[in-house]
């Protein structure tokens, strides 16, 4: 089983967009897949179909499985620890790690994705960040960046931090940002500074085919 952690250089850059496209392309290629997002904030229980868990569940071909995809769901569109506190919960990193490990143990699929919340250093609990969860799990990272002005600094900083903590980068996907500079120009800039991991792009126009990403990750 190929297991990956889908992380972002920031918030709302397209992690779920990339993860869904990857899952759909993998399924189209005959792979069995599953996905897990251990905690999500900004979740409206009255409109679950628009949520990240529901999008991932649809990409899995199991649209009713969003409760399994994300067992910890909070309403407020804030950092998970703050959103949880508003509902009387306190998130603990040990619990999130256990959730992810138990989920991984129970999988028997070709490709399993765990998607984080926010960016690499986004707080997950009152004392720990997304990075702490990633380090504890030790999975290769599929890193998603935007194409906005300033993304080079954010991406290179994230790569430096991830590698300093011993994490490997499976691939980098640049998810096209709205009203951003030319995508190809941005890709050229990023590739001039990052020579280890393959950088692919995920255009927003049309339906992005992630088949090349599947081939790269499963090789």
UniProtKB/Swiss-Prot annotation:
Pathway terms, separated by semicolons: Cofactor biosynthesis; biotin biosynthesis; biotin from 7,8-diaminononanoate: step 1/2
Subcellular location as annotated: Cytoplasm
Cofactor entry: Mg(2+)
Residues engaged in binding ATP: 12-17, 52, 115-118, 175-176
Keyword ATP-binding assigned: yes
Reactions catalysed: (7R,8S)-7,8-diammoniononanoate + CO2 + ATP = (4R,5S)-dethiobiotin + ADP + phosphate + 3 H(+)
Gene Ontology cellular component annotations, sorted alphabetically: cytosol
EC annotation from Swiss-Prot or TrEMBL: 6.3.3.3
A Gene Ontology BP annotation from the UniProt entry: biotin biosynthetic process
Keywords: ATP-binding, Biotin biosynthesis, Cytoplasm, Ligase, Magnesium, Metal-binding, Nucleotide-binding
Binding positions for Mg(2+) per the UniProt entry: 16, 52, 115
Subunit description: Homodimer.
PANTHER family attached to this UniProt entry: DETHIOBIOTIN SYNTHETASE (PTHR43210:SF5)
Function as written in the Swiss-Prot or TrEMBL entry: Catalyzes a mechanistically unusual reaction, the ATP-dependent insertion of CO2 between the N7 and N8 nitrogen atoms of 7,8-diaminopelargonic acid (DAPA, also called 7,8-diammoniononanoate) to form a ureido ring.
Protein known as: ATP-dependent dethiobiotin synthetase BioD
Originating organism: Caulobacter vibrioides (strain NA1000 / CB15N)
């Amino acid at each position: 089983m190929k297991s990956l952690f889908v992380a972002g250089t920031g918030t709302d850059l397209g992690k779920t967009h990339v993860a869904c496209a990857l899952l759909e392309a993998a399924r189209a290629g005959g792979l069995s897949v599953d996905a897990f997002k251990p905690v999500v904030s900004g979740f409206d229980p009255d409109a679950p179909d628009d949520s990240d868990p529901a999008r991932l569940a649809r990409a899995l071909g199991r649209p009713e499985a969003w409760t399994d995809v994300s067992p910890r769901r909070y309403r407020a569109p804030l950092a998970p620890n703050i959103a949880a506190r508003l509902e009387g919960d306190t998130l603990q990193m040990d619990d999130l790690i256990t959730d992810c490990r138990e989920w991984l143990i129970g999988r028997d699929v070709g490709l399993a994705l765990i998607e984080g919340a926010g960016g690499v250093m986004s707080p997950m609990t009152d004392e720990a960040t997304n990075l702490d969860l990633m380090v504890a799990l030790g999975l290769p990272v599929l890193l998603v960046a935007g194409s906005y002005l300033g993304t080079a600094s954010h991406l290179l900083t994230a790569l430096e931090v991830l590698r300093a903590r011993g994490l490997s980068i499976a691939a980098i996907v640049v998810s096209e940002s709205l009203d951003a500079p030319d995508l190809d120009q941005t890709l050229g800039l990023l590739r001039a500074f990052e020579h280890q991991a393959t950088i692919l792009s995920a255009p927003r126009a049309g339906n992005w085919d992630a088949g090349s990403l599947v081939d790269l990750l499963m090789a």
